[in-house]
């Protein structure tokens, strides 16, 4: 029965507008995204040990780097047993078709971001299986006071050509930290700067943190921002946190070529200051928090 349901889903897609997946490209003879958009020319790899983005090996930018703040990567955040149980419980509920070959499950209020309006609309909280995960987040520096009010589960599949286009998450409702738990397979999150202009690079003779600090003295090369892409390798069962510049000044995306096997991602979002104590919608924010942290929710 499950296999038949999957075959049925493979014949459908949720793409709208310019978005495409393998299914609609084959059925409607649409061009895949890489025939429309050129790949970035200046590729960097994020190094979690230094917090810098370094030019890809073998490229013209090898040996050059720049600081890339606002990224925290926590490996082995859940155990293999916890991962299997979380995905099993997710699969007990229906997945809805979404854009670009993804499927999704939403636990959160119904939001109209364009009109900046929201309503509870049946939102009863985050799922029970996330309670221990959220509690564990509070044990890590920078997440001690993290209180998510929304969880979005996304299912990526190479058979559907799943991907997600470069985008910035909303900042009217959602707060400073975006927290994503990566399950079932590793992937790459691709970051691109929003601002025009040039990006200054420093010589990066080695991957030692002290060498990176020394290289701050003399930026000696620049590259156009519109050609820059930073690849963050996200291992299976790891937690990725984006804050600051990485949250607000760099778009994030996942390219189709980086989905090698089924990948499930649970992204947790907190409230912005407008919905926190002292904000003009603090009462609504308190209602959302109370519902979310009851951990009694089903997908809405």
UniProtKB/Swiss-Prot annotation:
Catalytic activity: an N(6)-methyl-2'-deoxyadenosine in DNA + 2-oxoglutarate + O2 = a 2'-deoxyadenosine in DNA + formaldehyde + succinate + CO2; N(6)-methyl-L-lysyl-[protein] + 2-oxoglutarate + O2 = L-lysyl-[protein] + formaldehyde + succinate + CO2
Enzyme Commission number(s): 1.14.11.51, 1.14.11.-
Domain Fe2OG dioxygenase residue range list: 148-272
Cofactor: Fe(2+)
GO biological process: one example: actomyosin structure organization
Disruption phenotype: Embryonic lethality. Conditional deletion in developing juvenile mice leads to spermatogenic defects.
Broad class of enzyme this protein falls into: oxidoreductase
Keyword hit for Metal-binding: yes
Residues the entry annotates as binding 2-oxoglutarate: 263
Residue positions where N-acetylalanine is found in the record: 2
Cellular compartments annotated: Cytoplasm; Nucleus; Nucleus, Nucleolus; Midbody
Transmembrane intervals: none
Annotated binding of Fe cation, by residue: 167, 169, 252
Keyword Zinc: no
Family: Belongs to the alkB family.
Protein name per Swiss-Prot or TrEMBL: Alpha-ketoglutarate-dependent dioxygenase alkB homolog 4
């Amino acid at each position: 029965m499950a296999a038949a349901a999957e075959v049925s889903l493979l014949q459908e897609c949720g793409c709208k507008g310019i978005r495409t997946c393998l299914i609609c490209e084959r059925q409607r003879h649409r061009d895949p995204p890489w025939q429309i958009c050129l790949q970035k020319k200046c590729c960097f790899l994020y190094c979690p040990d230094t917090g810098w983005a370094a030019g890809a090996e073998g490229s013209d930018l090898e040996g050059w780097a720049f600081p890339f703040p606002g990224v925290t990567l926590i490996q082995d955040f859940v155990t293999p047993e916890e991962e299997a149980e979380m995905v099993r419980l997710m699969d007990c509920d229906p997945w809805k078709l979404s854009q670009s070959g993804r499927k999704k499950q939403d636990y959160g209020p119904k939001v109209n971001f364009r009109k900046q309006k929201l309503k509870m609309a049946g939102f009863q909280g985050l799922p029970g299986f996330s309670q221990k995960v959220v509690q564990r987040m509070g044990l890590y520096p920078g997440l001690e006071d993290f209180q998510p009010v929304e969880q979005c589960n996304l299912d990526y599949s190479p058979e559907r050509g799943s991907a997600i286009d470069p985008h910035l998450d909303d900042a009217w409702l959602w707060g400073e930290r975006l927290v994503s738990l990566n399950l079932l397979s590793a992937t790459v999150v691709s970051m691109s700067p929003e601002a025009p202009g040039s990006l200054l690079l420093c010589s990066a003779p080695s991957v030692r943190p002290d060498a990176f600090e020394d290289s701050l003295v003399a930026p000696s090369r620049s590259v156009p921002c519109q050609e820059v892409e930073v690849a963050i390798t996200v291992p299976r069962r790891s937690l990725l946190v984006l804050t600051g510049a990485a949250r607000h000044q760099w778009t994030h995306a996942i390219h189709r070529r980086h989905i090698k096997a089924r990948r499930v991602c649970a992204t947790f979002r907190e409230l912005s200051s407008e919905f926190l104590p002292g904000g003009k919608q603090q009462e609504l924010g308190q209602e959302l928090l109370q519902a979310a942290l009851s951990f009694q929710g089903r997908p809405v």
